[in-house]
Amino acid sequence: MDLALFFRNEVKPALGCTEPGAVAYAASIAARHCPGEPLSVALSLSLSMFKNGRDVGIPGTGGLRGNRLAAVLGVLAGDADKGLMALEHIDMAVVERAQTLLDAGMVTEEVVDGVPGVYAAVTLRCAGHEVTVTVAGRHDRVASIVVDGEVVGGEGMERAPEADGTLHGGASCEPSASFTKPPLPAYLEELRECDFAQLWDMAAGIDATLEQELLRGAAMNMAVARMGLESGWGLGVGHTLAAHAEAADLHARIRFMAGAAADVRMAGAPQPVMSSAGSGNHGITATVPVAVAAEGLGVSPRVQAEALALSHLVTGYLKAHTGRLTPICGCSVAAGAGAAAGIVKVLGGNAVQAERAVASLMASLMGMLCDGAKGSCGLKVATAAGEAYAAALLGMDDRGVQRPEGVVNPDIATTARALARLSREGFAAADAVMVELLGGGKH
């Protein structure tokens, strides 16, 4: 597998939550094709995009939240050339104007079925024109640009860009076109076919360039964690846990550092994090526990980099089975599993012990639901980080899950398939109910 390609696409900096970032990106493209004052903006979102963008802070807005605000900001001042960083340079004057338009009822938002988990269609109307820009499959993948009924750009619509080849829901929807089923990127197809020993060996074989990039990403996320400790952003999960922990307690430090980083990100701080599998919180969960363990135990930079590589590879492996956005909390079961494996590497363990740690982590957190990106994600990230360390200790003692336990199997491939099916079939109804509870009807 091309490791450089994997890390270039799956592990990269992100500013703010990726769901409203994708909405703002699409809206900024629409604005380019729709001259004049905006009259209305209509959002058609997948269930996952709706819940993950509904209540998360947007950087540069003073703590304001939501997909609808992101859309208006993208229309008014978004820079489409910056992709998911389209709102990087907005100022408070633009934010105030956007809030005025929101208060006037300019933006509507609805959840649609029959679309990929990553799906947002932004329809902008201005004097005499209507433009619809759709992102689908990945947060930065523009599937179509339609101006006054004519397709003028985009990579084409897909029926199932998710890793498992399925859709969320069954009905067709507007404004989407007919979908066709493409393959996963080749590097993810290859990753899906690996066994755990191969993941372990790939992590051990990273070159010097990847080593430095992985360490840079960990340093980026640790800086965000320290921000959370100092200032008590968001729910203050990390800040509060740290205030009541012994400084020498590595388990507690792993929990509060990871929680603090998620606090900062969910509150909308203008500070980038290194993401994993398309998610900043996945990136925090996959890196901060490993980095804290490496720092606390004094291992070499090379060992830390290999542990980080393993964490990202395990995270990517599991997400390649489940898809980008799922009803199950990916920070817990995917990135948390990656962190467990990475910590085993830091502790000096072997591949068998690391795979056992992955199984133990998943046995602990398999059923954790994703009810959207928001401040309380700091609690889930802190929990996943703490459980990752506990699972790693079990693995190092040759304990934990060693035979099938419920739906969890010591073999990562078997458990990944079970996780994908549970997420796709078992939790589909739960996802739909959550959207109703969150007010996901058109408004």
Swiss-Prot record:
Molecular function terms, GO-annotated: L-cysteine desulfhydrase activity
Example of a GO biological process term: L-cysteine catabolic process to pyruvate
InterPro entries: Ser_deHydtase-like_asu (IPR005130), UPF0597 (IPR021144)
Family: Belongs to the UPF0597 family.
Protein known as: UPF0597 protein DVU_0440
Organism of derivation: Nitratidesulfovibrio vulgaris (strain ATCC 29579 / DSM 644 / CCUG 34227 / NCIMB 8303 / VKM B-1760 / Hildenborough)
Organism lineage string: Bacteria, Pseudomonadati, Thermodesulfobacteriota, Desulfovibrionia, Desulfovibrionales
